[in-house]
């Protein structure tokens, strides 16, 4: 976002994280809103910085600010053959201000919640909604209850994909998180004591558990997102859970309403169905 607005190569942008001495307070990364909120804040900061640099370039090139363009890190006024490099413009700007500091911020806009006041936690209203569709292919071993995810297909609407490789990786990570929630991760208690209090019993998926994941990035344009972007996180996590249970129901004819769908629960459900079938009176033919 910053590089796009300033017309710079991405390698010039360095992100400083976790240093409260030089960056403002941040409430954290959650609620599938970071690209939307941080992206818009960065967009505003970049535009403020662009105004500073444009004015400096105008002084150096003896032109009007509105005539200044920056292409390939070279500032030019109109059809001038010779322009000023990014370094020259920054040097010119430093003469006026010393260290150049700009800020940008973003607050949830009223349109996000129907123009009305909203109540709840301090995270604010939802700015935009993403959409995700998922297909999960599974194999179920009815002798052991083990469910194996063979392949996952995901289509995720993230608005404008600012970085397609990052979006693809984010969606894949969301599928893994959904796998953990749906298949193995459980905060189980017995007599008030947590019995899954270590990483052996509270099992999270590893790369060994990962099936092939085919990601389809569906681009749309959110009118309030930075360059039209939305989230690419929890949407693909949430879609895995019902897709998995529907796939299991299709495979063995048993629907699960409790998560995680562990092997013991699958085996118990299969045994329960078998015992019920044995107890039910057999149908006999007759006239």
Task: Identify the residue ranges that each predicted region occupies.
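Cofactor-binding beta-sheet edge motifs in enzyme active sites
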Residues: 1-287
């Amino acid at each position: 976002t910053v590089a796009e607005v300033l017309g710079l190569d991405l390698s010039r942008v360095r992100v400083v994280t976790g240093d409260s001495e030089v960056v403002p307070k941040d409430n954290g990364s959650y609620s599938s809103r970071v690209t939307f909120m941080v992206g818009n804040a960065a967009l505003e900061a970049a535009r403020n910085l662009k105004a500073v640099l444009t004015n400096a370039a105008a002084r150096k090139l003896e032109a009007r600010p509105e005539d200044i363009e920056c292409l390939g890190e070279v500032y030019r006024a109109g059809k001038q053959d010779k322009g000023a490099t990014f370094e020259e413009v920054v040097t010119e700007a430093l003469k006026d201000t010393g260290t150049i500091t700009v800020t940008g911020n973003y607050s949830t806009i009223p349109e996000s919640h129907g123009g009305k006041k909203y109540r709840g936690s301090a995270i604010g209203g939802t700015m935009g909604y993403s959409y995700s569709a998922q297909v999960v292919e599974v194999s179920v071993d009815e002798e052991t209850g083990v469910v194996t995810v063979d392949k996952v297909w995901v289509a995720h609407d993230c608005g404008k994909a600012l970085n397609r490789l990052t979006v693809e990786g984010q969606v894949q990570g969301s599928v893994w998180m959904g796998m953990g929630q749906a298949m193995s991760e459980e905060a189980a208690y017995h007599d008030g004591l947590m019995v899954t209090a270590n990483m052996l019993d509270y099992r999270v998926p590893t790369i060994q558990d990962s099936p092939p994941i085919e990601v389809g990035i569906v681009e749309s344009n959110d009118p309030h997102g930075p360059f039209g972007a939305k989230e690419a996180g929890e949407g693909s996590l949430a879609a895995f859970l019902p897709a998995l249970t529907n796939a299991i129901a299709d495979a063995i004819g048993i629907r699960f309403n409790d998560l995680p769908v562990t092997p013991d629960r699958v085996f118990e459900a299969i045994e329960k169905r078998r015992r019920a079938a044995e107890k039910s009176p057999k149908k006999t033919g007759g006239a």
